[in-house]
Amino acid sequence: MNTFEINRVLERFDVDPDRGFLPPEDPLERMPARWSAWDQLGSDLSALIAIGTARRAIRELPDVDTDDLRNPAELRRAMLLLSVFGNAHVFCEPDPGLRLPAGLCRAWNAVANRLERPMIIAHASIVLHNWRRLDPSGPIVAENLRALQCFRGGPDEEWFYLLTAEIEATGARALPALVGLRLAIDRNRHDGVAEHLDHVSETILEMTRVLERMEERCRHAVFYRRIRPFLSGWPEPGVVYEGIDSEPVTLHGGSAAQSSLLNAFDAALSVPHEHPGTRPFLQAMRRYMPPRHRRFIEWLEEGDSLRTVVEDDGRLAARYDECIDGLVRFRRTHQQITMRYITGQAPDRDRAIGTGGTDYADFLRRTRIETSDRRLH
């Protein structure tokens, strides 16, 4: 399969050949003048949270029409800001603000509907669309990035988002290979499979090396007490979106499971998650992804099983197992780091819940085991 053909598939699903699920152009840093009040509140938000007036400021946001927001970059920036305001309103004070104001909700609902995503903070906004480069010609690595928007602010919160963005940028290098694998299997042409598998395993190793740096600049206690609460979801009894729906809504919070990247590796490498403790949550998380990205994962899943194709070829089976081993190492590393950030900080076991609302330790352990079980030899 030639590069042109692979890139055509990626383009169909809004996946950039170089940046993967990150936007093809650097995220918009400011809204057009008509929506400047959102930018101003975003700039002031950390200070307002610190002095206890953020909720009032969010409730006083002007009710601005969004019909003229059509540019994808503008919609993504709007979704980032409005999602941050929504989660900040709920969690910026000890008593949750469970009734979101109509002025915020009407704009948020219009933007979310166009993007086909729920009205809550998600990986797509806080990671994929939340960075700028210090050196515009430099690489997308954490040291060359600054977050466009934070809740409380500070280097720990920025590092958490930006290193995750670097993982996305690193993993992007394997996405053309995943497409190449699917096309090769579809056409029963296996001559390029070994090279694609090598590229995938090397990329997963690099992703793990980036992930291992999380604790360099994001302290456990700061994450648990200052960052994690704002990334939480709406558990029972739920949140009311005034002006949109009078009934409370429950939603999951931001979660690494909302990243299309690991889901794409699982789909291409024939790693199903069928356990009752993993499948329902992973399927639910797709709703929080950009719609074309989730369709890309579905397209990868629809192909014939890569595992079945390579299992009788010793050379390809060994390379396949290297990819599986790499995914297991990545998931083990993620599990270990998460344990230190959450379980190690939680005052009791009952509060050791991930931002997505799961018993994260059991979920991460099971996804790792399901991955390991796919080894051929």
Q: Where are these predicted regions, by residue range?
A:
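Surface-exposed peri-terminal alpha-helical interaction modules
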Residues: 1-377
